[in-house]
């Protein structure tokens, strides 16, 4: 791996001022070069870590914003290998953790061991396969341990105590909490069930908790911080800025920087 060495999630959480701000983007949306500049802008605006989605033709867990981003990236010619090349270029200017959010079919198609080997080579810190339950993750867990990559799983409001215990046993890095049931997208408020879920997961295990799906406003970040979340993952709100400014790259980057700065500040310890 060339470029900066990846910071661990543990170190990132130690360094974060309050609630960590972690933006999500789709690799190659709307094209490789613009995607790189978007990520650079997010890092410059204070992102504590990055979540990068690899575009997929049938993203079942994602709402219209991320589906649109996937489609733009695929139309721009993005492949799994080009996504890894993008990560390598990001590693040239930042050491913050980079997590992948992918569908297991992409991993399976390349071969589990080869996917994780290539991810480690590119500088990936953690991998979350959105449609991979822990009960079926033995190959992924083996590869993650082999290549020193954190394997992350989704925890939802419907996750029972026994399943949460199992997830806690095999996860590393952090727990990814789904803030609302259903697909991703910017929501207007934080549900009470999300706050209760944060408390339940924090009581169960020792891993930090990051909340995604629907986080889009400064007040969301403050509420989640106050409920005990260690970080927030913001995707659809940022992707909406991308899709709304495709004709003006400079304005797009300016608005992304402004949004990221506002959300980062909202999570501060005060």
Swiss-Prot record:
The active site is at 51 (proton acceptor), 62 (proton acceptor). CDD domains: Tryptophan_synthase_alpha (cd04724). One of its GO terms (molecular function) is tryptophan synthase activity. Its EC number is 4.2.1.20. Keywords: Amino-acid biosynthesis, Aromatic amino acid biosynthesis, Lyase, Tryptophan biosynthesis. GO terms for cellular component: cytosol. It is an enzyme of class 4 (lyase). It catalyses: (1S,2R)-1-C-(indol-3-yl)glycerol 3-phosphate + L-serine = D-glyceraldehyde 3-phosphate + L-tryptophan + H2O. Pathway: Amino-acid biosynthesis; L-tryptophan biosynthesis; L-tryptophan from chorismate: step 5/5. InterPro entries: Aldolase_TIM (IPR013785), RibuloseP-bd_barrel (IPR011060), Trp_synthase_alpha_AS (IPR018204), Trp_synthase_suA (IPR002028). Tetramer of two alpha and two beta chains. Belongs to the TrpA family. The alpha subunit is responsible for the aldol cleavage of indoleglycerol phosphate to indole and glyceraldehyde 3-phosphate. This is Tryptophan synthase alpha chain. The gene is trpA.
């Amino acid at each position: 791996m060339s470029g900066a060495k990846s910071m661990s999630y543990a170190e990132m959480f130690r360094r974060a001022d309050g609630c960590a701000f972690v933006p999500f983007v789709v690799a190659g949306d709307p094209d490789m070069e613009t995607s790189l500049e978007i990520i650079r802008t997010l890092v410059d605006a204070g992102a504590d870590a990055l979540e990068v989605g690899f575009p997929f033709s049938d993203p079942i867990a994602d709402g219209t914003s991320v589906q649109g981003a996937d489609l733009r990236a695929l139309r721009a010619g993005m492949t799994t290998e080009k996504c890894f090349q993008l990560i390598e270029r990001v590693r040239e200017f930042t050491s913050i953790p980079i997590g992948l959010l992918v569908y297991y079919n992409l991993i399976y198609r390349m071969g589990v061991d080869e996917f994780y080997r290539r991810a480690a080579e590119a500088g990936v810190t953690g991998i979350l396969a959105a449609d991979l339950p822990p009960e079926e993750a033995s190959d992924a867990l083996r590869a993650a341990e082999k290549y020193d990559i954190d394997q992350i799983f989704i925890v939802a409001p419907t996750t029972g105590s026994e399943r949460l215990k199992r997830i806690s046993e095999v996860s590393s890095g952090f727990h990814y909490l789904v803030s609302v049931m259903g697909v991703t997208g910017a929501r207007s408020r934080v549900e009470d069930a999300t706050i209760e879920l944060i408390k339940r997961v924090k009581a169960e295990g020792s891993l930090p908790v990051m909340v995604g799906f629907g986080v889009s406003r400064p007040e969301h970040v403050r509420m989640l911080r106050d409920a005990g979340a260690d970080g927030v993952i913001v995707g659809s709100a940022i992707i909406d800025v991308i899709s709304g400014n495709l004709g003006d790259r400079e304005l797009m980057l300016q608005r992304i920087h402004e949004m990221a700065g506002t959300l980062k500040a909202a999570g501060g310890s005060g």
